[in-house]
Amino acid sequence: MKGSVLILAAHPDDEVLGRGGTIAKLAHQGLAVHVAFLADGVSSRSGDPTAQQDDLISRRMAAQKACDILGVKSVYFGDFPDNRMDTIALLDIIKPIETLVTKFQADTVFTHHAGDMNIDHRRIHEAVSVACRPQRGHPVKKLLCFEVPSSTEWQLSGAAPTFAPNWFVDISDTLDRKLAAVEAYAAELRPWPHPRSRRGVEHLARWRGAIVGFDDAEAFMLGRQLA
């Protein structure tokens, strides 16, 4: 990879769960990695405005800490409603994504898989697909989709496209940083056995590595590559 990398995620912690080791690896290689969270990640949890604001501040602080651990160059926080992005017109989601792509002149974009259970994930995938159309002069040359434990694999069989990875990144040297970033989101972790537990995240990295001959890996689906 070369140039600028942009991760377009729904919620803080999606970036770590889906590709934290890859972020750390690319940052270590000297690439500018930018992370954008489009939804607030908390507003669906409580009807109390004060509690919502406190949760929002805590979640964003955790996100900044995690991104600092991974070596992210910049972090953007959007304010689309959590778990309600299906109530937003698609064009209104596309526009800020296009602005971010143009701002960072992103050569590579990572985003959610089309078949995730979470509605915000699916909506962002749809918007990114439109925003990154391969028009003449468009900066994005590679579009990859990541998995998110407790969303991607929980979709019902046959209900949506299946995540079938065809692009793997060796994160054997950066798994420790991924797990440290996961710990920054302590409030979002679940006890084992749960795919979004620390142990679950580590197990997934081991499994994704084992199926391609690495100690640890992250798996992606290549949506498009222009060479």
Q: Across the structure, where does each feature detected by a protein language model lie?
A:
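Short, surface-exposed acidic-centric catalytic microdomains
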Residues: 33, 39-73
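Short, conserved clusters of charged catalytic residues that mark active-site
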Residues: 17-18, 58, 92
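Metal-dependent de-N-acetylase/amidase catalytic core
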Residues: 1-8, 25, 29, 50-54, ...
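Histidine-anchored nucleotide/phosphate-binding helix
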Residues: 18-41
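Short N-terminal helix/helix-N-cap motif within the alpha/beta-hydrolase-1
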Residues: 16-17, 119
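Short, glycine-rich nucleotide/cofactor-binding loops
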Residues: 7-16
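Short glycine-rich catalytic loops that host catalytic nucleophiles or stabilize transition states
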Residues: 38, 77-81
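Cofactor-binding loop segments of dinucleotide-utilizing enzymes, especially the Rossmann-like FAD-
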Residues: 10, 38-40, 148
